[in-house]
Design a protein with these regions (language model features):
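Acyl-donor (CoA/ACP) binding surface of acyl/acetyltransferases
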Residues: 1-25, 57-153
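Short loop/turn motifs at secondary-structure junctions and domain boundaries
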Residues: 48-54
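Conserved GNAT-fold acetyl-CoA-binding loop/helix
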Residues: 26-46
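Short, P/G- and charge-enriched loop/turn segments at secondary-structure junctions
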Residues: 45-48, 134
Length: 153
């Protein structure tokens, strides 16, 4: 039986799970994203993610359980997306179904994503949903694959 995958607005109770997912050692290694301390994480989410009306933020719910999130935001004149799924939801097609649903709601195009080079699962997910790799960019010490969906791809 296929899992139910839905999107909904973020509720305050989701943030503790998002923090726990960020602290998963394998997820941190794959993303090369250093987990933040609880207070820094909560402040970032409340002020920068949820506090910016230009952002579009959705919680991924699988069979009634909070599985992760998708976020769209502006960086200068480019609209980016990012996401985080708990490890229990990897490799089961959940990311593909959730991203497909998110892209139906987030209609800005072109839309960009830049997972770290080596995060092949994330690159594959984006490509399955129509993103095309256009090159690489550096963020600090890490090289990232720049992918785009829509015009300019």
């Amino acid at each position: 039986m296929e899992n139910s995958v839905q999107l909904r607005d973020v509720v305050p109770e989701d943030l503790e799970l998002f923090l726990a997912y960020e602290h998963d050692p394998d997820a941190a290694r794959r993303s090369r994203f250093a987990p933040r301390e609880s207070e820094a994480f909560m402040t970032h989410w409340r002020t920068r993610v949820l506090g910016d009306p230009a952002n579009f933020v959705q919680t991924v719910v699988v069979d009634g359980e909070t599985a992760g999130n998708f976020v769209a935001w502006w960086e200068e004149d480019r609209r980016f997306i990012g996401y985080w799924l708990g490890r229990a939801y990897w490799g089961r097609g959940i990311g593909t179904r959730a991203l497909t649903a998110f892209l139906e709601r987030e209609t800005a195009r072109p839309l960009y994503a830049d997972p770290v080079v080596g995060n092949t699962g994330s690159v594959r997910l984006l490509e399955k949903c129509g993103f095309t790799a256009t090159g690489t960019v550096r963020h600090g010490e890490n090289e990232h694959v720049l992918l785009v969906l829509g015009e300019g791809a």
